UniProtKB/Swiss-Prot annotation:
InterPro entries: Dup_hybrid_motif, LECT2, LECT2_chordata, Peptidase_M23. Gene3D superfamilies: Glucose Permease (Domain IIA). This is Leukocyte cell-derived chemotaxin-2. Pfam families: Peptidase_M23 (PF01551). Keywords: Chemotaxis, Disulfide bond, Metal-binding, Secreted, Signal, Zinc. Residues 1-18 form the signal peptide. Belongs to the LECT2/MIM-1 family. One of its GO terms (biological process) is chemotaxis. One of its GO terms (molecular function) is metal ion binding. It comes from Bos taurus (Bovine). It is found in: Secreted.
Length: 151
């Protein structure tokens, strides 16, 4: 049997090692941010034409399973573009003090509860729209602050 001190220590260490958000893409051991390629860079505030990138791009292969980063509610559909229909899909998730938009996924649902690490959907085919890009999930805080620290 474990002592109370041992159990308390384990409870404190586990979340610290896990980080606040779950691994977002199947087959990855961490939430790695996209580096620069011919289509731009994936870090927060990277230059994009005449604007700054307002989220982060987490590497993920086209067609991979995408997981919820935290427990919360899927609030509805989000579309990043007016066109580019092959990848123009995503969701808004809110819970535990977080509110994010996740783009380039085909979600399993647009409303309802979701748990941290539960299947959220599938990454859409970025290569069809942006050949040669490092395929990724775009994650953006609803208040446009930097989400990098939660990855």
């Amino acid at each position: 049997m474990f002592s109370t001190g041992t159990l308390l220590l384990a409870a404190l260490i586990s979340p610290a090692l896990a980080g606040p958000w779950a691994i977002i893409c199947a087959g990855k051991s961490s939430n790695e941010i996209r580096t620069c390629d011919g289509h731009g860079c994936g870090q927060y505030t990277a230059q994009r034409n005449q604007k700054l990138h307002q989220g982060v791009d987490v590497l993920c292969s086209d067609g991979s399973t995408v997981y919820a980063p935290f427990t919360g509610k899927i609030m509805g559909q989000e579309k990043p573009y007016k066109n580019k229909n092959a990848i123009n899909n995503g969701v808004r998730i809110s819970g535990g003090g977080f509110c994010i938009k996740m783009f380039y996924i085909k979600p399993i649902k647009y409303k309802g509860s979701i748990k941290k690490g539960e299947k959220l959907g599938t990454l859409l085919p970025l290569q069809k729209v942006y050949p040669g890009i490092q395929s990724h999930i775009h994650i953006e805080n609803c208040d446009l602050s930097d989400p990098t620290v939660y990855l």
